């Protein structure tokens, strides 16, 4: 396994560990999720470019679109929770009953 793949995989693992450790604040969780999506995007792009997958050229762009949608929804939820309760604790998400 080349060094580039190992570094990207380690970036994914560090982001995953950050998500598991810093799960009390919503902003920390969102930043760790963005790190995971960024490492997945780079891994998918490097894989497509190295293996010359012509049918999978759009896959990194589609993943980037999903990451942008996830970020927009996460930030809107962060704004709603912080305006309602004054903090960005993940525990406050249990109080949001529709």
Curated annotation (Swiss-Prot):
Chief localization class? mitochondrion
Q: Which reaction does it catalyse?
A: a ubiquinone + NADH + 5 H(+)(in) = a ubiquinol + NAD(+) + 4 H(+)(out)
Gene Ontology molecular function, alphabetical: NADH dehydrogenase (ubiquinone) activity
| Membrane topology designation | Multi-pass membrane protein
Record EC number: 7.1.1.2
Keywords in UniProt for this one?
Answer: Electron transport, Membrane, Mitochondrion, Mitochondrion inner membrane, NAD, Respiratory chain, Translocase, Transmembrane, Transmembrane helix, Transport, Ubiquinone
Q: What class of enzyme is it?
A: translocase
One Pfam family this chain carries? Oxidored_q2
Q: Name one GO biological process term.
A: ATP synthesis coupled electron transport
Indicate the secretion signal residues. none
Judging by the UniProt lineage, the source's domain of life is Eukaryota
GO cellular component terms, alphabetically, are: mitochondrial inner membrane; respiratory chain complex I
UniProt subcellular location: Mitochondrion inner membrane
- Subunit field text: Core subunit of respiratory chain NADH dehydrogenase (Complex I) which is composed of 45 different subunits.
Q: Function of this protein?
A: Core subunit of the mitochondrial membrane respiratory chain NADH dehydrogenase (Complex I) which catalyzes electron transfer from NADH through the respiratory chain, using ubiquinone as an electron acceptor. Part of the enzyme membrane arm which is embedded in the lipid bilayer and involved in proton translocation.
Name the record gives this protein: NADH-ubiquinone oxidoreductase chain 4L
Can you name the source organism? Ursus arctos
Q: What gene, per UniProt, encodes this protein?
A: MT-ND4L
């Amino acid at each position: 396994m080349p060094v580039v793949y190992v570094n990207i995989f380690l970036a994914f693992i560090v982001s995953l560990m950050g998500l598991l450790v810093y799960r009390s604040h919503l902003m920390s969780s969102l930043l760790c999720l963005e790190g995971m999506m960024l490492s997945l995007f780079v891994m998918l792009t490097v894989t497509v470019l190295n293996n010359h997958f012509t049918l999978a050229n759009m896959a990194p762009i589609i993943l980037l679109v999903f990451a942008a949608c996830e970020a927009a929804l996460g930030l809107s939820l962060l704004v709603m929770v912080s305006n309602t309760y004054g903090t960005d604790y993940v525990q406050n998400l249990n109080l949001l009953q529709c």
